[in-house]
Amino acid sequence: MDKVKHSKIIILGSGPAGYTAAIYAARANLDPFLITGTNKGGQLMNTNEIENWPGDYNKISGSELMNRMYKHAIELKTKVICDTVISVNFKKNPFFLIGENNKYTADSVIIATGANPRYLGLQSESLFKGKGVSTCAVCDGFFYKNKEVAVVGGGNTAIEETLYLSNFVKKVHLIHRGINFRAEKILLDRLEKKIKSQKIIIYLNSIVKNILGNSSGVTALLIEQKNSKEKTESKIQVSGLFVAIGYTPNTNIFVNKLKMKDGYIQVTRQEHGNYTQTSIPGIFAAGDVIDHVYRQAITSSASGCMAALDSERYINSLV
């Protein structure tokens, strides 16, 4: 490893939250480092078309949007470092970080390492990712207008995705491995109304065995349903599959270092600034590591902006 590299602000993560934080920190003349991590560009790199980014009504790919953010950050003199931080020491300032390639110190750290959606683990799932298999109905649902789709999951996210899709797709097939949904009652009440309208078909005690398709994308699912005495297999014709079985925040290295809940970093959300401060002053968090509800590119960018402003205020207080 080279000698220790120091920056006033080090940003961990290269998704919308990380790059937005870098842009704001650079404009404040804080000369930020942005350490990309292994998942460069974040989840958006797997999104073929984005139709809800303000100002880009002609659609934009996730990779194109992230490339724009990268160029913007570079133009403002952000130092983008291709490394992955594997260990941190937040006990005293300057904070100490160890990467696979270098060691770093910083007066303030912004954690924007994101979260990864959980998948079913099928080989065919990887084959059709971005070609019919998605983890975000708000991002990709509109492409299936007047088509039949399936949703897998049994919690709040799965029910919310199902209800959202049912507003414009032809039919939603909701597949759940259990016999009872884990969602809130208000969501289940809405689901019941949609079922009566025959917009949603429920498959309980069921799992997806295989995803079928061709070069154009997904065409059908092979599902297995467990009855009291036997298992039966059936095929349903769909154009898309939305996997909604949860997310895993990329926060393992912060366990026992920061206050967390279910893997998500807890922030103070104070009324007058420090909305993104973690349990340690000077350490801030943004994007999907703090958000298990909205998970949109624009909300991640917004929290990245707030984290940079909070971090700037903290650094100024050290002078």
UniProtKB/Swiss-Prot annotation:
In the UniProt record, does the keyword Disulfide bond occur? yes
The protein's name in its UniProt record: Thioredoxin reductase
Source species, please?
A: Buchnera aphidicola subsp. Acyrthosiphon pisum (strain APS) (Acyrthosiphon pisum symbiotic bacterium)
Q: Which cofactor does it need?
A: FAD
On whether Disulfide bond is a keyword of this UniProt record, the answer is yes
Q: Which InterPro entries match?
A: FAD/NAD-bd_sf, FAD/NAD-binding_dom, Ferredoxin-NADP_redctase_2, Pyr_nucl-diS_OxRdtase_2_AS, Thioredox_Rdtase
Q: Which Pfam families does this one have?
A: Pyr_redox_2
Lineage of this protein's species? Answer: Bacteria, Pseudomonadati, Pseudomonadota, Gammaproteobacteria, Enterobacterales
Q: Which Gene3D superfamilies does the entry link to? A: FAD/NAD(P)-binding domain
The record describes its quaternary structure and partners as: Homodimer.
- Could you tell me which NCBIfam families the record lists for this protein? TRX_reduct (TIGR01292)
* SUPFAM superfamilies the record matches: FAD/NAD(P)-binding domain
Miscellaneous notes: The active site is a redox-active disulfide bond.
PANTHER family xrefs: THIOREDOXIN REDUCTASE 1-RELATED-RELATED (PTHR48105)
GO biological process, any: removal of superoxide radicals
Question: Which keywords label this protein?
Answer: Cytoplasm, Disulfide bond, FAD, Flavoprotein, NADP, Oxidoreductase, Redox-active center
Task: List the GO cellular component terms.
Answer: cytoplasm
Report a single Gene Ontology molecular function: thioredoxin-disulfide reductase (NADPH) activity
Q: Where in the cell is it found?
A: Cytoplasm
EC number(s) on file: 1.8.1.9
**Cysteines engaged in disulfide bonds, as pairs:** C136-C139
Sites where the protein binds FAD: 36-43, 288-297
Question: Could you give the cofactor binding note from the entry?
Answer: Binds 1 FAD per subunit.
To which protein family does this belong? Belongs to the class-II pyridine nucleotide-disulfide oxidoreductase family.
